[in-house]
Amino acid sequence: MAAAAAAAAAAGAAGGRGSGPGRRRHLVPGAGGEAGEGDPGGAGDYGNGLESEELEPGELLPEPEPEEEPPRPRAPPGAPGPGPGSGAPGSQEEEEEPGLVEADPGDGAIEDPELEAIKARVREMEEEAEKLKELQNEVEKQMNMSPPPGNAGPVIMSLEEKMEADARSIYVGNVDYGATAEELEAHFHGCGSVNRVTILCDKFSGHPKGFAYIEFSDKESVRTSLALDESLFRGRQIKVIPKRTNRPGISTTDRGFPRSRYRARTTNYNSSRSRFYSGFNSRPRGRIYRGRARATSWYSPY
């Protein structure tokens, strides 16, 4: 027994040296009662010798292998922080907040077309206001523009100028209602150059009142035209007398004109004796105005 124990100790020492530090090997007696280290593959040795090992505590647990993290994609410069699903701490909260932020641009995209439509409408209104302003300015310019030379004179004439023009004018009475200014001008054509022919008409009916005024270029033509007094014009004997200027504040009814309002139809002639029709004019208080004006019954043609 002593020899067997010594052999086992020697074998253990030899096995310990060959197995590395901290490793112990024990030989268990075989079936024949002898302890020994034989070839496990030899015949008759199966189950005769069993080997047991005692491992150190450090060798019982395997060393953990370091886990390699998958490479993360690099974000381009200036890109925002990790988005949803990045796996970073607090990413769940960050995922919720960007979700709200992303919903705001959607609402803004819905409001943008409405805002653009409002701005477009405002621009259209401003353009319309500018056009209206331009039209108003144009109308004011046209209203402030001086009338043609043939009609402007009587409107801006002073009393002295009016008297001078009346001194070159005559009154023609008992004129046929169907007579025209051209026919009257032709009737007095031999007396001198005619500047203006005015046929007075009733304001309400528009029918001629049966008398007219003829303005010549010089006073000599007035004296010549008086020779046509009681001459026949369109089958009627007309009355030709010099025209008299009405002074402000003086009213005369000695000519027996009806107390009614009237308007005048005036035709002007320039120095070259070319004619043009100037429309209906009125002669309140001896003055000629453009358009349809009113005159009282105390008007005197002289």
UniProtKB/Swiss-Prot annotation:
Residues 1-12 have a biased composition (Low complexity). Residues 30-47 have a biased composition (Gly residues). Keywords: Acetylation, Coiled coil, Cytoplasm, Methylation, mRNA processing, Nucleus, Phosphoprotein, RNA-binding. One of its GO terms (cellular component) is nucleus. Arginine dimethylation is asymmetric and involves PRMT1 and PRMT3. It does not influence the RNA binding properties. Residues 111-147 form a coiled coil. Residues 282-302 are annotated as: Interaction with PAPOLA. Residues 2-141 are annotated as: Interaction with SKIP. It comes from the Eukaryota. The RRM domain is essential for specific adenine bases recognition in the poly(A) tail but not sufficient for poly(A) binding. Monomer and homooligomer. Identified in a IGF2BP1-dependent mRNP granule complex containing untranslated mRNAs. Binds RNA as a monomer and oligomerizes when bound to poly(A). Interacts with PAPOLA, but only in presence of oligo(A) RNA. Interacts with NUDT21/CPSF5 and transportin. Associates in a ternary complex with CPSF4 and NS/NS1 and interaction with NS/NS1, blocks nuclear export of host cell mRNAs. Associates in a single complex with SKIP and MYOD1 and interacts with SKIP in differentiated myocytes. May interact with SETX. This is Polyadenylate-binding protein 2. It comes from Mus musculus (Mouse).
